[in-house]
Amino acid sequence: MKKIAALIPARGGSKGVPHKNIRKLCGYPLILYSIAACKFCKEIDDIFISTDDREIADIAEKYGAKVPFLRPKKYAGDNSTDYQYLKHFFSKIDVDEVALIRPTTPLRNPVLVGGFIEKYFKTKEQLTSLRSMHELSESPYKFFKINDKGYCEGFFEDYEGIKDYTNLPRQSFPKAYHPNGYIDIIKKETINTGHTYGDKIYPVVTGYVTEIDTLYELKIIENELKISGNLLIDLLQYDGKELIIA
């Protein structure tokens, strides 16, 4: 079985939800859900954290992740890009690719993650990256922006020559997908070309995923966990695994 290192990006300066990456979700720091998913995924053999924040680093290390260095602050601002911290990571750690596991998507099935990793290794020579996504209920062709004059305006000039395309039935448009952070696989080779994902992105489609960018979304996931439970919660509460629980 081929294995891969995981990288969890967790900067300290979240504005929407202060201290988001270590905020408690049903009693556990948010970042722990992603660490746990990696620990319980047999295709992942190492877990790294990219953070500029010492407190986040200490908590991550407590739960068994590696923080061999802190991310430079210049790569951890509101306008910093994934490419910047990924290039920095690959310059420090000698791996060919990483599974990018974003802590803002906490509810993952480790078996599903492993299946996506297996798919990557079967076709990696033909890909520049792998990216998870879920289907949108509405096409971007149904979306509006508000123009400088204060009126609604579609994002596109037309659809197949039709100007008034926003009133077409949604079935008229191709399916659209939203990247959701469940798992991405980033290749050092692609980063070295100056791109994060490249032009041959392999899609893996999940069910709908709630990402945490606001307190409201945090509450949604917390309520979901309280009502339905989750595999990771069960695994975290099981003491037969080598995972330290505070």
Question: Predicted regions span which residues?
Answer:
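Conserved SAM-binding loop
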Residues: 23-24, 49, 100
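N-terminal nucleotide-binding beta1-loop-alpha1 segment
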Residues: 1-18
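Short phosphate-binding loop-to-helix
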Residues: 54-99, 107-118
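Short active-site oxyanion
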Residues: 43-48, 208-209
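A short, N-terminal amphipathic alpha-helix
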Residues: 30-45, 62
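Conserved core of the sugar-phosphate nucleotidyltransferase
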Residues: 106-199, 204-206
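Hydrophobic targeting segments
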Residues: 3-8, 31, 46-49
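Conserved alpha/beta core of the MobA/IspD/sugar-nucleotide pyrophosphorylase nucleotidyltransferase superfamily
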Residues: 80, 174-246
